[in-house]
């Protein structure tokens, strides 16, 4: 959230609610992030001279719970050079709910790669963000028409609550 300013703060509460609903439905929750020092791999932040470890910290309000996977990556996609695809195959995932920073970078790259691996993707509009609203909206439009269902957080939470009720009744 250090690179996306005010837009990032607006996504905190919807993302917190989404995480709670996913956990209640018994779905695996997986985080991706980076370390500031990635053995010489340079990022835009590093080129600007502003890269710090704090830039990549997961905010306390959204912190992983014990047992939730945190995938450390060196590039925009959570899949590139990481064990993410192996883990998703192991847990039998068929669909992914994707959110985070930035819509035009990491969210887009991970969504395109997930689509290429055959996953059905949902990108949650209020739980993604970018440096500019224009960039955010254009990328959501493009992702929706090619690689994912872009949905509102309330719709996704409603589906997750229904799934939780179904699993509880079973």
Residue ranges and their predicted role:
Residues 1-65, 159-170:
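Active-site acidic carboxylates
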Residues 24-27, 92, 118:
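Glycine-centered short loops/turns at secondary-structure junctions
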Residues 97-100, 119-133:
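A short glycine-rich beta-strand->turn/loop micro-motif centered on a GG-aromatic cluster
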Residues 59-101:
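Internal catalytic-core helix/loop-beta-alpha segment
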Residues 103-110:
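Short glycine/serine/threonine-rich phosphate/pyrophosphate-binding segments
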């Amino acid at each position: 959230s250090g690179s996306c300013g005010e837009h990032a703060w607006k996504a905190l509460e919807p993302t917190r609610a989404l995480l709670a609903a996913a956990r209640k439905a018994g779905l695996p929750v997986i985080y991706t992030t980076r370390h500031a020092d990635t053995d010489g791999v340079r990022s835009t932040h590093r080129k600007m001279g502003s890269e710090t470890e704090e830039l990549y910290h997961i905010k306390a309000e959204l912190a992983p719970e014990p047992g939730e996977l945190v995938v450390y990556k060196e590039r925009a996609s959570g899949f590139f050079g990481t064990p993410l695809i192996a883990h998703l195959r192991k847990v039998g995932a068929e669909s992914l709910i994707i959110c985070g920073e930035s819509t035009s970078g990491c969210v887009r790259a991970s969504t395109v790669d997930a689509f290429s691996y055959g996953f059905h993707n949902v990108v949650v509009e209020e739980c993604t963000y970018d440096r500019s609203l224009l960039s955010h909206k254009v990328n959501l439009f493009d992702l929706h028409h090619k690689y994912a269902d872009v949905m509102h957080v309330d719709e996704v939470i409603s589906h997750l609550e229904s799934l939780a009720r179904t699993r509880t009744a079973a």
